[in-house]
Amino acid sequence: MANLSYWLLALFVATWTDVGLCKKRPKPGGWNTGGSRYPGQGSPGGNRYPPQGGGTWGQPHGGGWGQPHGGGWGQPHGGGWGQPHGGGWGQGGGTHNQWNKPSKPKTNMKHVAGAAAAGAVVGGLGGYMLGSAMSRPMLHFGNDWEDRYYRENMNRYPNQVYYRPVDQYNNQNNFVHDCVNITIKQHTVTTTTKGENFTETDVKMMERVVEQMCVTQYQKESQAYYDGRRSSAVLFSSPPVILLISFLIFLIVG
């Protein structure tokens, strides 16, 4: 982590230095660079520009023959035929009042970001996510008949659970309770629409199976959540990152 921070700092300083050098480089062209002269001064070929206006001979203000202000034939102010002030047909002054030209649709970045973030969330379930597939646990229910029934029907029970992020719950029990309820409800509704019904024994066994999987899901998500927080704390407490942040603040304030 420290090596990565040093590399990030070095890359930022190098980029900032290059940008600073680019800003100091003189731009090509400009006045008196050898390619043009002030009006009235001799050009390299010995000719002189007209004494005023910058147009060609007989052009008082830079237009063509008979162009008082830089337009075409019969153009008082630089527009086209029938254009009083530089617009097109029916255009009084430029880009306004164009012929019902539709504006280009603008992309809503919030919609784009929302669509990208919705990949991990199950649509229509109010923010619930679907966990990865798990192996169904081997459970014992206290008698041989139920144990045999479970082994024969375990493939009909869920092997994935629905859950919310762990930071929305105060403890494991609340997470597991919510996880079990939504998972069984969704699995029951989905299976019933396919023409298959569950008995009371099925529901009892599903509750045991899903509870075990929800506990496993909570442990996995909780570990990932705390690992992420710890990594962020270590990153922002490293000396190179602190130095980089201080340098950025100095540039912004200065």
UniProtKB/Swiss-Prot annotation:
One of its GO terms (cellular component) is plasma membrane. It is found in: Cell membrane; Golgi apparatus. Sequence repeats lie at residues 51-59, 60-67, 68-75, 76-83, 84-91. Cu(2+) 1 binds at H61, G62, G63. Keywords: Amyloid, Cell membrane, Copper, Disulfide bond, Glycoprotein, Golgi apparatus, GPI-anchor, Lipoprotein, Membrane, Metal-binding, Prion, Repeat, Signal, Zinc. Residues 51-91 are annotated as: 5 X 8 AA tandem repeats of P-H-G-G-G-W-G-Q. Disulfide bonds join C179-C214. Residues 25-104 are annotated as: Disordered. GO terms for biological process: cellular response to amyloid-beta; cellular response to copper ion; cellular response to xenobiotic stimulus; intracellular signal transduction; learning or memory; negative regulation of activated T cell proliferation; negative regulation of amyloid-beta formation; negative regulation of apoptotic process. A lipid is attached at S231 (GPI-anchor amidated serine). GO terms for molecular function: amyloid-beta binding; aspartic-type endopeptidase inhibitor activity; copper ion binding; cupric ion binding; cuprous ion binding; glycosaminoglycan binding; identical protein binding; microtubule binding. Residues 1-22 form the signal peptide. Cu(2+) 4 binds at H85, G86, G87. Glycans are attached at N181, N197. Residues 52-95 have a biased composition (Gly residues). Cu(2+) 2 binds at H69, G70, G71. The normal, monomeric form has a mainly alpha-helical structure. The disease-associated, protease-resistant form forms amyloid fibrils containing a cross-beta spine, formed by a steric zipper of superposed beta-strands. Disease mutations may favor intermolecular contacts via short beta strands, and may thereby trigger oligomerization. Its primary physiological function is unclear. Has cytoprotective activity against internal or environmental stresses. May play a role in neuronal development and synaptic plasticity. May be required for neuronal myelin sheath maintenance. May play a role in iron uptake and iron homeostasis. Soluble oligomers are toxic to cultured neuroblastoma cells and induce apoptosis (in vitro). Association with GPC1 (via its heparan sulfate chains) targets PRNP to lipid rafts. Also provides Cu(2+) or Zn(2+) for the ascorbate-mediated GPC1 deaminase degradation of its heparan sulfate side chains. Monomer and homodimer. Has a tendency to aggregate into amyloid fibrils containing a cross-beta spine, formed by a steric zipper of superposed beta-strands. Soluble oligomers may represent an intermediate stage on the path to fibril formation. Copper binding may promote oligomerization. Interacts with GRB2, APP, ERI3/PRNPIP and SYN1. Mislocalized cytosolically exposed PrP interacts with MGRN1; this interaction alters MGRN1 subcellular location and causes lysosomal enlargement. Interacts with KIAA1191. This is Major prion protein. It comes from Cricetulus griseus (Chinese hamster). The gene is PRNP.
